[in-house]
Amino acid sequence: VIVDAYLKGIGDFDAKKALEACVATANIDSYRGIGLYKKYGYVPYNVTDQYNSENWSLSKTLEYAYDDYCIARMAEKLGDKEVADEFYKRSRNYRNVYNPVSSFMQPRDDKGEFIRNFSPDDYTPHICESNGWQYFWSVQQDIDGLIVLTGGKERFAQKLDSMFTYNPSADDELPIFSTGMIGQYAHGNEPSHHVIYLFNAVDQPWKTQKYAARVMRELYQNTPAGLCGNEDCGQMSAWYVFSAMGFYPVDPVGGKYEIGTPLYPEMKMHLPGGKTFTVLAPAVSKENCYIQSVKLNGKNYDKSYITHEQIMDGSVFEFEMGDKPGQAWYSPR
């Protein structure tokens, strides 16, 4: 939150002091396994103490790596190369829990051995309120690196397809936080929220559009119980607002928003300085959820994302919509 605010110019605060606080917090060895994370490059699942009692070793490793990336981004912007280099290196620690044999992120012990009898659809103490399917994608800082680690775009796309089609069996006892399920995707629990938008990274944007439209229309209702899961700091609603406008921040501090599918024919965001950001999709409907082409300020647009600067400049994005999947309008990534 601090880094996102700083990079977007929100708030009046001492950025250098804020960075110092972030770095200090990320180096509190006695706090929730951070010392173990720094020592091994991951939090081992078999080491617990008074500061690391709840386990969640895999979740901590992946989330600490993203936090490190955020610190690196802020340090880089402030010109602190030493801190930026250190934390960019730490942000790659996600690789330390990837098991090429299972092709999943997997808990490891303090000897470096991956946990035995691992099943990605099991809910265990090593992953916070999720399973191995849902946390595999928690590398928002380096999706391209995750694709390479997995074996390339084709294999990554196959894994994404499986995420949305591998349904729990009738015998599976799902925990209370696994709601809004599409295959192993759990929209009622926030760790999954960016996964729909990853199809853009493998040049299959029509799947992002299909699933985003489905979630918006089926899993959000204008009723007292209209959300399919815990709101958790407003994230369920934030996902909907972003997605309804046709984009979503896979990497919240990256400055880019992956294009999905707009929900309404016209949406406007009134900005400081009298500017207005506009999204137009005159033909959009339940059936016409597929993007055929995109224009930015009247000119053909060939990116899978929009930028924060384009929003704040008061740009006009226009989407040509259709009822059949269109090919990627953007240059392959």
Model-derived segments and spans:
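Short strand-turn-strand beta-turns centered on an Asx-Gly dipeptide
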Residues: 272, 296-299
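Generic "edge-of-domain/loop-turn" microfeature
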Residues: 274-276, 286, 301, 324-326
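Active-site-adjacent, His/Asp/Glu-enriched structural segments that form or flank metal-binding
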Residues: 1-7
